[in-house]
C-alpha cells in the first residue's frame, strides 16, 4: 500500500540535538573527501586515467573528489548498455517501477544528512539549503512514483458497437540527463528518475562542479537494486562528450537545466535528424531567468523588503528563481530600498561548514562574471550595499544592492546568477508590469500588493511560469508549485507537476473489432 504523498520535512536547526547530529554528518563526510569517482556503465565501475577534480568553493585547497572522465567511446558503451536494458525495463509494470522509486526515496531519507553534508562541501550550500535540496529530491521521486501509477491505465476513450478502444502510455527509449550544479541533488534526481519510472533508460552526465553529489544517487540506485544499464553515469568534459550525447542517434530525449547558451545549442543540435534516426528528439529544458519582485504602493514595506532580500540572496543568488530585479512603486521606493539595505547588512557570509547564511559562489568563472556585473552595475546605477568580492581562499561575493537603475541597463537585462539585485522605480502599476515583462526570460515573479484588481491584472499580464502573491519568488514546492517558465526560460515542462512524466511517454491507441 502506498501512503498519500506529502513533502519531506527539513531539519530544525534550532534544536541543538539536530545541530550536533549534522555536525557529525559533516565530520564523517569530510573524512571521506578526495575520493575517486568512477564512471558507471552497465552497472560496472570504470576508473579512467584522465580525471578532473571537484573542489570546495568555500575552500579551494580542499579537493572533494577525483573524477573519472568519460570519452566518446565510453558514451557509446553506455548507450549500448542503456539500449539493452531498455528491452526489459520497459516491460516492468508501472507499479513495480513506481515501487522501486519509493524504495529509492526511503534510502535517501535514511541518508539525508550525509547527502546534505556533501552539498555543504561540494556546492557551498548553507545547511538549510543543503537539507532542502535533499528533501526536494525525495519529493520529486515520491511524486513521480505516484504520477506513474496514476497513468498506468491510460485515459478513457469512446467505444462504439463492435469496437473497443484503448488509449495508453508507453516509454520512448534511451535519453540523456544533463542536470545543473545549483540543485545538485534535487534536480539531478528528479530529471533522472522521472524518465526512468516512465520506463526509459538514461545516461546521466552530472554537472562538472558537483559530481560527488550525483554519484551518491548512483550508490543509492545500486543499493535499491536497479537493473544494470538503466542509469549509466558518464561524468566528463562537456567539450568532448556534450554535443556527442545530444547528437547521438540513440538519444530520444534530453533533459537539461542550465544556461540559455547551452540550452539553445541543445535545441539546435537535437533538431537535426541523424543518419539512421527514426524518431524526433524531445528536449525538456529549463534555462534560467531574470526574475523580479514587483512592489505596489500602499503595502507592508517590511514584507516587501524581506521578500526581496531572501529571494535575492538565498544560496548566494544562485537559483534560477532568484530575485535579480526589484521593481518598486515610486511612493514606497525609498522606504523599501532602505529596509532592504538594512536587512542585507545583517547577513553573514563565509564557509558554510560553519552554517553561515551565505556561502561562496560555485567557481572562479562565476566569481569573475559576478564581479564584472557588479562593476557594470555600479556605473549604471548607485551601489547601495555590498559589492565586495574575495577569492583568496574561496569564491565569496557580498550580497549586493544597486539602486537607481533603468530597465534597459545591462544588469537589468542579463542573467547574473549571483547575489546581486537591482532596484528600479515605476510611476504606477501598469509601468511596474511593463518593466517586469521587459526581459527575454519568464521564469518566476512575485507581486507585493493589497490591490485585488492589480493582482488580477498581474495574473493575466505578468509573463512568467510561476507567479506568487505577497511573498518571495523562490522556493517552489513539489506538488504545490509545478516549476517551469516561459520565453527564454525554457520549455515550461513543469517539474513536480501531474503532466511532467508525459515528456517521457508516447501515447498509443489500440482498436479491437468484434
Curated annotation (Swiss-Prot):
SUPFAM superfamilies: ALDH-like. Its EC number is 1.2.1.88. Keywords: NAD, Oxidoreductase. It is an enzyme of class 1 (oxidoreductase). One of its GO terms (cellular component) is cytoplasmic side of plasma membrane. It catalyses: L-glutamate 5-semialdehyde + NAD(+) + H2O = L-glutamate + NADH + 2 H(+). Pathway: Amino-acid degradation; L-proline degradation into L-glutamate; L-glutamate from L-proline: step 2/2. GO terms for biological process: glutamate biosynthetic process; proline catabolic process to glutamate. It comes from the Bacteria. InterPro entries: Ald_DH/histidinol_DH, Ald_DH_C, Ald_DH_CS_CYS, Ald_DH_CS_GLU, Ald_DH_N, Aldehyde_DH_dom, Proline_metab_enzyme, RocA. One of its GO terms (molecular function) is 1-pyrroline-5-carboxylate dehydrogenase activity. The active site is at residues 286, 320. NCBIfam families: D1pyr5carbox2, PRK03137.1. Belongs to the aldehyde dehydrogenase family. RocA subfamily. This is 1-pyrroline-5-carboxylate dehydrogenase.
Amino acid at each position: 500500500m502506498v501512503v498519500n504523498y506529502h513533502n519531506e520535512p527539513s531539519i530544525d536547526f534550532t534544536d541543538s540535538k539536530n545541530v550536533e547530529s549534522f555536525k557529525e554528518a559533516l565530520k564523517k563526510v569530510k573524512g571521506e573527501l578526495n575520493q575517486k569517482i568512477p564512471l558507471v556503465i552497465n552497472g560496472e565501475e570504470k576508473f579512467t586515467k584522465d580525471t578532473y577534480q571537484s573542489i570546495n568553493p568555500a575552500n579551494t585547497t580542499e579537493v572533494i573528489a577525483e573524477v573519472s572522465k568519460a570519452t566518446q567511446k565510453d558514451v557509446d558503451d553506455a548507450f549500448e548498455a542503456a539500449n539493452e536494458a531498455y528491452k526489459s525495463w520497459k516491460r516492468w509494470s508501472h507499479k513495480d517501477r513506481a515501487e522501486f522509486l519509493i524504495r529509492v526515496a526511503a534510502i535517501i531519507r535514511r541518508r539525508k544528512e550525509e547527502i546534505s553534508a556533501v552539498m555543504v562541501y561540494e556546492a557551498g550550500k548553507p545547511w538549510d539549503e543543503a537539507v532542502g535540496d535533499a528533501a526536494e529530491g525525495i519529493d520529486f521521486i515520491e511524486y513521480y512514483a505516484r504520477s506513474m501509477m496514476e497513468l498506468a491505465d491510460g485515459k478513457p476513450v469512446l467505444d462504439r458497437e463492435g469496437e473497443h478502444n484503448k488509449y495508453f502510455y508507453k516509454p520512448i527509449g534511451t535519453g540523456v540527463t544533463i542536470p545543473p550544479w545549483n540543485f545538485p541533488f534535487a534536480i539531478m534526481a528528479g530529471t533522472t528518475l522521472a524518465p526512468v519510472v516512465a520506463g526509459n533508460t538514461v545516461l546521466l552526465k552530472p554537472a562538472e562542479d558537483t559530481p560527488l553529489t550525483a554519484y551518491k544517487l548512483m550508490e543509492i540506485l545500486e543499493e535499491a537494486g536497479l537493473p544494470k544499464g538503466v542509469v549509466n553515469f558518464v561524468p566528463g568534459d562537456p567539450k568532448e562528450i556534450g554535443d556527442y550525447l545530444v547528437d547521438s542517434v540513440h538519444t530520444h530525449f534530453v533533459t537539461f537545466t542550465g544556461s540559455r547558451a547551452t540550452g539553445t545549442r541543445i535545441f539546435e543540435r537535437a533538431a537535426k535528424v541523424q543518419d539512421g534516426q527514426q524518431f524526433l528528439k524531445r528536449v525538456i529544458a529549463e534555462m534560467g531567468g531574470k526574475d523580479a519582485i514587483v512592489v505596489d504602493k500602499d503595502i507592508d514595506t517590511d514584507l516587501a523588503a524581506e521578500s526581496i532580500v531572501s529571494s535575492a540572496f538565498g544560496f548566494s543568488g544562485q537559483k534560477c528563481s532568484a530575485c535579480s530585479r526589484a521593481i518598486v512603486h515610486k511612493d514606497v521606493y525609498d522606504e523599501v530600498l532602505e529596509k532592504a539595505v538594512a536587512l542585507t547588512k545583517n547577513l553573514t557570509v563565509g564557509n558554510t561548514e560553519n552554517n553561515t547564511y551565505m556561502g561562496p559562489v560555485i567557481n572562479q568563472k562565476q566569481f569573475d562574471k559576478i564581479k564584472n556585473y557588479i562593476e557594470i552595475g555600479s556605473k549604471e546605477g548607485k551601489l547601495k550595499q555590498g559589492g565586495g568580492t574575495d577569492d583568496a581562499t574561496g569564491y565569496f561575493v557580498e550580497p549586493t544592492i544597486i539602486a537607481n537603475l533603468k530597465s534597459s541597463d545591462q544588469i537589468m537585462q542579463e542573467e547574473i546568477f549571483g547575489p546581486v539585485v537591482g532596484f528600479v522605480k515605476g510611476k504606477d502599476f501598469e509601468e511596474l508590469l511593463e518593466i517586469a515583462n521587459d526581459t527575454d526570460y519568464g521564469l518566476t515573479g512575485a507581486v507585493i500588493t493589497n490591490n485585488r484588481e492589480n493582482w488580477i491584472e498581474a495574473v493575466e499580464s505578468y509573463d512568467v511560469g510561476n507567479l506568487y502573491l505577497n511573498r518571495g519568488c523562490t522556493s517552489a514546492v513539489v506538488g504545490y508549485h509545478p516549476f517551469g517558465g516561459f520565453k527564454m526560460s525554457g520549455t515550461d515542462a513543469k517539474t513536480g507537476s501531474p503532466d511532467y512524466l508525459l515528456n517521457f511517454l508516447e501515447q498509443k491507441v489500440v482498436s479491437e473489432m468484434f
